[in-house]
Amino acid sequence: MRVITLAGSPRFPSRSSSLLEYAREKLNGLDVEVYHWNLQNFAPEDLLYARFDSPALKTFTEQLQQADGLIVATPVYKAAYSGALKTLLDLLPERALQGKVVLPLATGGTVAHLLAVDYALKPVLSALKAQEILHGVFADDSQVIDYHHRPQFTPNLQTRLDTALETFWQALHRRDVQVPDLLSLRGNAHA
């Protein structure tokens, strides 16, 4: 099982990247291959000038194609997810998330930014044809106690992250279940 984690903050370390660090640790403990990407892996010029042939973008797209899921984390600024993340998502092929389970994670100054994930980020993930976009986790700044060292969260946030990661894990495994095609079943019923 392969998962890509994508840190959408233009800064590192950041509160949103600490959520990803926690997720990576949990998934690594479950023998999941985790490939981590952050915006610093891409030359700013490649993102700003839409260089679709950038080596980093090609590698990222190839790894994403082979992945089962994506966990994307972003800070919320002015009621929207990171503009730097948007520039990267705009460069991905139209069906880049086809067949993928996606878990969005976001941080913001206050809970007033909570809906930015649902109304700004999720539509873009959907446009990239994600198979399943999970509810995700939003954390306000007060819930991320330490992000400069080992991530530390309030108990409430830790519980929500654990629940979201469990849901992500279950969704990844649902992808493996082979369900017969409905049309072929109808054909057999009339035979």
UniProtKB/Swiss-Prot annotation:
GO cellular component, as recorded: FMN reductase complex
One GO molecular-function entry: protein homodimerization activity
Keywords: Flavoprotein, FMN, NADP, Oxidoreductase
Catalytic reactions of this protein: FMNH2 + NADP(+) = FMN + NADPH + 2 H(+)
Domain of life: Bacteria
Pfam families xref list: FMN_red (PF03358)
One example of a Gene Ontology biological process annotation: cellular response to sulfate starvation
Enzyme class of the recorded protein, top EC level: oxidoreductase
Annotated family: Belongs to the SsuE family.
NCBIfam families on file: FMN_reduc_SsuE, PRK10569.1
Function summary: Catalyzes an NADPH-dependent reduction of FMN, but is also able to reduce FAD or riboflavin.
Subunit composition and interactions: Homodimer.
Name of this protein: FMN reductase (NADPH)
Species: Escherichia coli (strain K12)
